[in-house]
Amino acid sequence: MSDEASETGQRYNGQPILKRQKPILPYICSTLDFQEERDFLAKSIFPRLNDICSSRGTYFKAVDLRWSAVKAHKSFTSNQFRQYSCLQSQHLKLSLDYVNRCFPFFIGLLGQTYGDFLPDYTPFLLSQVKDFESLSKGKKNLYIAAKNGYPWVLKTPNCSLTEFEIIQAVFRKKSQFQFFYFRTSNSLLRTFNEEEEEEEEKLSSAYLLNEQGKMKVGKLKAKIIGKGLPVRFYRDLEELGDMVWKDWSAVVEKLYPFTTIMGNIDYKHSFENLYHEEFVENCKQVFVTSKESNRTFEILERFAIKDLDLDLDTDSTIAGSGLDSILRINSLPTCKSILLLSGERGCGKSTLIANWVSNFQSKHPGVLMIPYFVGSTCESCDIMSVIHYFVMELQHRANGPRLEMDFLNEDSNVLVFSLLVEVFIAAISLKPCILVLDGIEELIGIYGISGQKAKDFSWLPRSLPPHCKFILSSVSSSLSCKSLCARPDVKIVELNSIGDEDTKFNIFRQHLSPADQERFGQSKPILRKKPNLSPLKLAIIASELQECKIYRNEFQCLREYLEVASVQELWELILKRWVEDYSWTLKPKDTTLDTVIPGPSGWVVDVLCLLCISHCGLAEDELLQLLDTMGYRDHHKVTAVHWAAFRQATKTWIQEKPNGLLYFQHQSLRSAVEHKLLGVSTPVRESNPNVAQNSVNHKKAHFHQVLMRFFQRQTIFWRVYQELPWHMKMSGYWEGLCNFITNPSITDFISKIQNPSLWTRLHLVHYWDVLLEAGNDVSEAFLLSVAKIEGEQFQKLKKRTTLSVLECSLSEITAADKGRIILFIGSFLKLMGKINEAEKLFLSAEDLLLQSPSMTEMLLRAQNAIGELYLEIGMTPKGLTYFQKAWSNLLRFTLSDLKISQELMKQKVKVMNNLAESAPGEFLKENHVLEYATEISKYVTGNPRDHATMKYTEGVLMLASGNAALAKLKFQECLTIRRWLFGNKNILVGEIMEFLADLLFFLLGENEKSQKKQAIEYYKQVIKIKEKADTVATCKLVRKHLSISLSDTLCKLAGQLLSGDFCHHATMEAVSYLYRSLDLRAAHLGPTHASIEGILHLLREIQRSRGRRSWPQSMNHLFPNGSRNGFSLWENVPKLNFHSAQSSDTVNTAMCMNIRRFQRVKSTQPSLVSDKPKYVPGKGKKTLAPILCKSAEEKFQRQASDSQIWNSPRRQPARKKAACPLKTVSLIDKNGLVRLSRQSVSSAELDSRKGLITSICRQPLQRPHNVDNPWKSISELVSEKWLFHTPQYCFTPQKPGFPRRSQIESKLLKTSDDPNKE
């Protein structure tokens, strides 16, 4: 990489790759008289701290357990009183648990009060406890805390809860992130004193007046100061807020220093990386080594490093070998490139693989390994997300962190599943790599394919590059496992039992707390009675025993849990305990439900169901707010303490992602919730939206409605975008979904995102498709939204301090905002095939931006977008006008401006490429576009897509200037880059392949035969690519254009085959291609088109020359009376008039003028330009001079229009009546050698019915009909203009007087469909 490119790459690459960051969770410790301070910090300071954390890949959340909110109510049931009693007795234990969970972060607020404490100085002894229920509240707390990991509390039993928390956080551990704030004035005590009478039952007067308490708090402050901890003194709330902000913003800065964060960046991929790292770390904490795990480790490592030995030290991109591997992929010998680790659910596959990945990466840091754990997040199960993640990681790792990956997020091809798979195949061919995909039985298909196809791996090629190793894990009974076992390249490793009894005990002990591990011996005899327990069962039971003993007899629970046969039954028992020990239900009058739903109920049930129904998970504060909206308020309120007790019991199985959202850690728990609590048989993520409305799924539909109403009122865009449209879809609320995606506020936010991720774009396209299927016109809704934006017609908003995302006003919208939003909507409509609507919006945006001189950068974006749209639908002269406008605007910016603006550089690349494809040679020379392109090409090496585009642009411009040899090199470099970006089946790759195949015949030299062979191979690959593109195209007119283009390629391939040695096999192959081309032209251009006439004439000449006996029987029936009678069918067919798609005054003119220069570059030998074909004496065969059926000069002019149509299968040209045919121009040198160039026809207006057709090269075509030498006649026919659908040419046979058409061929014509009847 050049210094200029390196400098530019550093400036451009503002998006850092986020690393795994632990959240900042300070524990808030204070006495009861600090409610006002806590409220102020929670509302004013902590949200600001969370904002700066969120931009650095983490979050800030203060843990504030407000025990004062926990009160008993006279309406409590007996079970609720039991819950209340258990909760009060674990006050100290739960607080210390959360102090440990929050370590090393701690905030202490101290004043003049100390808190409740035991006044008796007599030490409290556990051995003296005979009746737990007879103990006082304070002693119960000491007993529970001492029995659950905190025996040290018995050494100082006379401390208050506040001092116990401070001792645990500060004096038993060391940390630099602990801050104390001492209140120096008693003014804030007034509120507390005024409420003293109302709180007599809870706060006695002795609490404040006791001299012993004052002395204790004084000593505590002295100890804190004496330890050297940071202490701040404040007088009022504002001063406290400033101190807390200053201290904790400095903590954030120290832990996670500020990097160059670009605004409005979609960090979806970076966060996904964090989730998988977090999953590995969690599995490492509970992993237990055994003989079985060591054996499996060895198998996995041997498999992973096999065939990689020679490449372990290679750290650079092996582009050449990668491309070779792509080309060889179908001919590779069968090798074991996939390892499948299978086993029963719960046997420990995920934990084992996660630990092996960590172990392998530490042993072999130079080997490229990318792990992916399905289910590590709620949205990680979709197959499109999985493949996209692998591609992103492979490209980053293979090409360095500075590589810009915008091409994946910009290219519409990645929205098509089959094309994304091709990108994946290209990515794994870059260099040796090991991919790990755990839990494949949980894969689903939401956006690309069906869930069944995602699971059966039929999308994966039958063979992979030998240097790519794919390690998968699955449940033995799954569809994925059965499908993969049938593949010859899969090695099966069955994970059997966990090992001996000691291993089982170690797994059980690993999931116990340190205090419980000391009493583990009491559980051993019970566990020995169940020798076949899986690791998952052991983990579930062990983690459950830590908390259930506070509420019930732990050994009775253990026996009950061990009796169940399956994991599903075990979860049902545990869910039942959670509901009984932590939950309560609402009375019918308090609930928001219209009807009573049978089955388990209560807030714990509701929380689990909400988590299961959510699209991407829910945060703790969101769940508590949801419970409040569902009726859990007042004395039914779920307080922070109730929530803390529940989370402490479920922390192992309901975990937090790095962004703070909760999710189910194991699929078995999700399945149990779906089956037992929701009552559904189909997994929620795979269910149909319409099914939610059935009475059987009324509960599921209810929770979708609850979440939909909740997120309609939320203020954080990404959370709204993640959840709200999903629940609208699942609820069948089509009107609301349509209003959401066309809402100006939503559009405004998305349009600000500089590089939307695949996930963000997939959602928009997915919801469009869903609405379209439901019969909603989304494009019309977008146009109405634009009309409101332009007219500034916005609803009057209610006066509230905060507005939801959907209520945000655009009343103060600027001209730049309007232009940005309209351009975004226009681009999206164009992507979805709404060309007419997109054109109107682009033109409207240009008019708007022209009125604002300061909006030059956005204006050139609009002008370039308009030009590309016109180029796509064939209106090249109009498109050129806008490209020239954009070029003029770009000249206002200096090279320095381009270096510091990524968007400007991208626009420069696009405009130069579009000019090269549409502008005349004079314009390009006068404006020195080639010199500009050469300079700009140095600065885009960091963006592979733009780099390839510039190579292509340079090649076209060099070809226009006559340097064909150097142009060919540029095209080959472009092909190399596009191959390793997109694979071998992308239409962009096909285009450059076809271009090179055409160009080869201008540069035939000593290796003429090998070049012909390469060109033929290129043509065959292009045909496959175009056939594939046709299958994914949804627009009828797009398929028509693809079919016509395919017809041309078939003719070119046939022409090259016939220009060879005329062996029987090559001739028959050429004839088959001609017949395919004939069928396509008859279907799409009409049976009266002149090119059909010419192809039939060529086929008859081939038949006559080869003889009837060698002609395929299937073809003879078309000509029962010989070639003359058959040809009479087309005698009086009129010429079909087409409209133009391209200007004749383009670079093609320059290339036609320089054709002789190309010949000189090719060779100076006179034999190559002889007007006579080469003849091999005695062989009876003649080798024709090279025939270029579709020239390289013309190919680049259709690059933009064809590629954009091909790239987006959804796009529909705006005017269906306008076809875009191509005319053929014959090029004849001074020696009479026939060369063909296919040139697009020109027209000033696509709408006019009469196109002005301008011939670039007007030399008359000499076509003597040689009866004595049939092969010479065929070579002339192959070189004719009618071989392509030329609008200006009408085939006229040399010999007049052909007989009338036969009745058989007349019937064939009558049955042909009129292509214009669409």
From Swiss-Prot:
Signal sequence, renumbered to the chain: none
Pfam families: NACHT
Residue stretches of biased makeup (Basic and acidic residues): 1302-1318
Keywords noted in UniProt: Cytoplasm, Repeat, TPR repeat
Positions of TPR repeats: 401-434, 653-686, 819-852, 860-893, 993-1029, 1047-1084
Main localisation: cytoplasm
Tissue/organ expression: Highly expressed in lung and myeloid leukemia cell line (at protein level). Isoform 4: expressed in heart (at protein level).
Region (Disordered): 1295-1318
Superkingdom: Eukaryota
UniProt KW Nucleus keyword: no
GO CC, any one term: cytoplasm
Protein name: Tetratricopeptide repeat protein 41
Lineage: Eukaryota, Metazoa, Chordata, Craniata, Vertebrata
